[in-house]
Amino acid sequence: MDLSRTRLPASLGRIVAPLLLAVAASGALAQQDADRFPAAAMSFLGGELPAMEAAIAARDRDYFENAMGRMLDFSDSWGFKTRDNPALARFPMCTDAVSDFLVVGMCRIMTTNAACEPGMSARFNSNLQQCRALAAKL
């Protein structure tokens, strides 16, 4: 009766199983191809900007709270808010457009807010146009 042989696979399984789960999880969190980011940013903004315009017209501040969650989810999926994806540094116009669109929209409702800088809307529009042009090229 050789008990060491029957125990080895079980103990090995207890060691290997968590490692395999960690590898699988890291694969699920693998970064997306950075070259696709401008198109993804424009797709995200293409859905959000019309909804934001409707919210501004209706003075619906609830939109902004929900949109903030969607923006954070998008940012997290690409790793640019946490600096997990340094490859996105080549696309500051796109990361800034995604980061700033809600502030620009809120400033159209709450014009006296301290975060509402005079040039913010112009910078956002410039970043949006540059990101759109880049997305069309890539």
For each feature predicted by the language model, list its residue ranges:
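Sec-dependent signal peptide hydrophobic core
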Residues: 12-20
